[in-house]
């Protein structure tokens, strides 16, 4: 009889723009080869979905576009969307799992899902598997908080994070398993997005918010140092107009475009450009880098241990805060013949191979 695994993410199905909900969906799909899997979500997104009502973070973020609502919510908490999702899902997901027992819980939505899983473990001794996607962001602040739930197995993305975990929780079981990429969806073959830009085209993907860690302004500054290079920005957020004005000022109206597309069309966007970059301050998840490489694109990224491991020989890492160095790295990347190196690098992160490693962990719990 197959083990029953409950994968938890309320936002899955409601939004496809975030890395954690996409991973929850992909993990549910691929773990179903080995186990009886249920994906607990607020909206139907796969044949494995069990729809349980709550207020997912995406719905709160939409409400926050109203300045009055945003002001009211952020007066009391820095991340109201995650808090509201966590509270409302705790009230509905916990009773469900009390009556629909599983053998392993696998929360994917930060402390909200961990709280649900902790109650179920307390009642029924059900082990918890958790993937720490924040890594060393904010000097490990999120990681330290989530360690208080003491998951039966914690999955991290690199050796540095594993060593940090053991420095503060020596008894914690930790496994290193990379995040996956859908190689069937992201590949060089297929339709291309018609962006109409001239010359070599550099792509960046991310939320357009001056307050986040993506640092899109650094890309704009770097491209402004180069001739015959255009910038395609794929994303949405509260500061679209700000970045549009900055691009117009730095690049001119003919050398950039800001577009918003459905997730299903993202592969077409990757195929339409010559290289990819994201100069984020920290990027423990790394989904967009993997998608870009799987699409055949070389990558320019921030120089840190995670991205050196992730990108390998499929691109260039540099000090992106040094605009001259960043611009030179982009120029080198666009003038280099990369052949199949990016695709070969991405092949190590197929969801099939990642799911097999997770399956081995689940069988051991």
Q: PLM ranges: what are they?
A:
Residues 261, 268-273, 358:
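Short alpha-helical donor nucleotide-sugar binding micro-motif in glycosyltransferases
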Residues 313-323, 331-336:
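Conserved acidic donor-binding segment of nucleotide-sugar-dependent glycosyltransferases
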Residues 298-301:
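Short hydrophobic beta-strand element within catalytic cores of glycosyltransferases
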Residues 281:
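Aromatic "clamp/platform" in nucleotide-sugar-dependent glycosyltransferases that forms part
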Residues 244-261:
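Nucleotide-activated donor-binding/catalytic signature segment of Leloir-type glycosyltransferases, i.e.
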Residues 8, 196-214, 220-224, 232:
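Conserved donor-binding/catalytic core segment of Leloir-type glycosyltransferases
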Residues 85-86, 107-113:
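Short His-centered aromatic/hydrophobic patch
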